[in-house]
Amino acid sequence: MDAFKTHLAIVASGAPLSREQARAAFDDLLSGEVTPIQAGAFLTALSVRGESEDEIVGAVSAMRARMLPVAAPEGAIDIVGTGGDHSGSYNVSTLAAILTAACGVPVAKHGNRAATSRSGAADVLAALGVKIGLPPEALARCLSEAGLCFMFAQTHHGAMRHVAPVRTELPFRTIFNMLGPLSNPAGVTAQVFGVSRPAWAEPLTRVLATLGSRRVWTVHGSDGLDEITTTGPTAVVALENGAFRHFTLDPREVGLPLATLDDLRGGDPEHNAAALGAVLEGTRNAYRDIAVLNAGAGLVVAGAAGSLAEGVARAQEAIDSGAARGTLARLVAVSNA
């Protein structure tokens, strides 16, 4: 572990690691051969100084090399966020993924249990009856038959167990909070990617581009949500055709009313599952509005809608026609088969 000590000394000095050095350092971290003290010191020093783009690229490369992959159809996307916005909101990206899949775009959703909220994607899907922690073959079947799968991070990133105790002991977020969302096991190249810190938006979009993504909307709500929000404007950094573009979205521009954070506040997995089911049954409320907005973005990123307004309209129709309800029912059935 002399090489890791060298990398630790570089980070502790305040200097950045090269992409190759970061890849090597995270290979060591994920191998389980680094002591807890060394791992804690390394992650703390990185967090205090702030991670460079090359360090994130190297770290994600190490994560992806060790993950359990899933075969996904061409054109599959993910709708995911870094979490950590402490909003306690409904499971927006989960419902948006269901709506997007109901519109014919395969969604390889990657997520975990709750970190800073009461209900993560894994929690609410389990409450809805979806079997969690499936092997790659079963997930490929979900994608083929339901157009949607849920890849449980703990199943696909087993090497994370080596750093989990250290992360639990540290009273702050580390680079690993962004590595999971950047390491989709299905290798999707189109994403709606929510960030809880506005400073992350541009660098993480560039990281995704470096790692092979072709079309990305990285979003941060003005209220702090790691989603496209309906309480006000959302800042977007878009990767399209190799170019980067910055713009702001307002839900009123696509016919959706403004909401408050209280309107979007959820509860435990059972509460959120009931709310999600109610939307699929036709309930019109703030949860529906924010979900169709994010699904609309997913359709744009997938190339299945020419504008956000068109994407939102298609997501609305997926609910009203019962298609979205059918997508969830198929996912529940196939995942438990």
Swiss-Prot record:
Cofactors that this protein relies on: Mg(2+)
Disulfide bridge map: none
Residues given in the record as Mg(2+) 1 binding sites: S93, E227
Pathway note: Amino-acid biosynthesis; L-tryptophan biosynthesis; L-tryptophan from chorismate: step 2/5
GO molecular function, one term: magnesium ion binding
Residues that bind Mg(2+) 2: D226, E227
InterPro entries, alphabetized: Anthranilate_Pribosyl_Tfrase, Glycosyl_Trfase_fam3, Glycosyl_Trfase_fam3_N_dom, Glycosyl_Trfase_fam3_N_dom_sf, Nuc_phospho_transferase
Enzyme Commission code: 2.4.2.18
Family named by the database record: Belongs to the anthranilate phosphoribosyltransferase family.
Subunit (UniProt): Homodimer.
Official protein name in the record: Anthranilate phosphoribosyltransferase
